[in-house]
Amino acid sequence: MSMLCYTLIITLLIGIWAAPKSEDNVPLGSPATSDLSVTSCTKTHEALKTSRNTDQHYPAPKKEEDQEFGSAANIIVDPKLFQKRRFQSPRVLFSTQPPPLSRDEQSVDDANSLNRNIRAKREDHPVHNRGEYSVCDSVNVWVANKTTATDIRGNVVTVMVDVNINNNVYKQYFFETKCRNPNPVPTGCRGIDARHWNSYCTTTNTFVKALTMEGNQASWRFIRIDTACVCVISRKNENFG
């Protein structure tokens, strides 16, 4: 009886030892592990390939300058911004066509200009009578492509060149005055007594309200532009004997 029990126990142990092992306990290098490795590598390769194909569908990120320019070109401005008189400046004009430089030229049509009262002010320049001369010679010009300027705080800001209003593109013009020549006469400013005074002509600036970019929105800011040509004089050193 005891021998029969021992025989059954040994047979049972041999059967358990000969049973196939699970994949979790398979040693490295066995066929099961190789199949898992190949499958894993194949999935990884397909994932990388899919990632590359996905990247090709999306363009590379744009530069900061390109993003700023693109956003500035696509911004639509609310017409209500132009209804407040405190934002209007006689030297800033929004128009679909170049404005005239003098009253002798053809006026800008009211339908093509947002600043209708500004055009009239620009035409009221004083006309000198014959025999009258300016101390300095100046030149007036409409600046149409001003992209940057210095604001009243001394910071460089982005100026909106084109403005989209009700699906109409208006250009922002600045009426600037500059000196034609720092020395209109050999001695400096015209009409200054060169025996006692040194003189020269220089361009001066003032601040006007202009439409600028602040992030992705349009905003009014005071910016500096050239507005006059003045004479600067200084007394000459006199030797007293």
UniProtKB/Swiss-Prot annotation:
Mark out the compositionally biased spans (Basic and acidic residues): 47-65
Q: Where in the cell does this protein reside?
A: Secreted
Q: Which residues form a coiled coil?
A: none
User: Do you know which SUPFAM superfamilies this protein is assigned to?
Assistant: Cystine-knot cytokines
* Pfam families, per database record: NGF
Query: Which biological process annotations from GO are given for this protein?
Result: cell surface receptor protein tyrosine kinase signaling pathway; modulation of chemical synaptic transmission; negative regulation of neuron apoptotic process; nerve development; nerve growth factor signaling pathway; neuron projection morphogenesis
Where does the UniProt entry place glycosylation sites? N145
Which residues comprise the propeptide? 19-122
Q: Where is this region: Disordered?
A: 47-69
Any idea what job this protein has? Nerve growth factor is important for the development and maintenance of the sympathetic and sensory nervous systems. It stimulates division and differentiation of sympathetic and embryonic sensory neurons as well as basal forebrain cholinergic neurons in the brain. Its relevance in the snake venom is not clear. However, it has been shown to inhibit metalloproteinase-dependent proteolysis of platelet glycoprotein Ib alpha, suggesting a metalloproteinase inhibition to prevent metalloprotease autodigestion and/or protection against prey proteases.
Identification of the protein by name: Venom nerve growth factor
Organism whose genome encodes this protein: Bothrops jararacussu (Jararacussu)
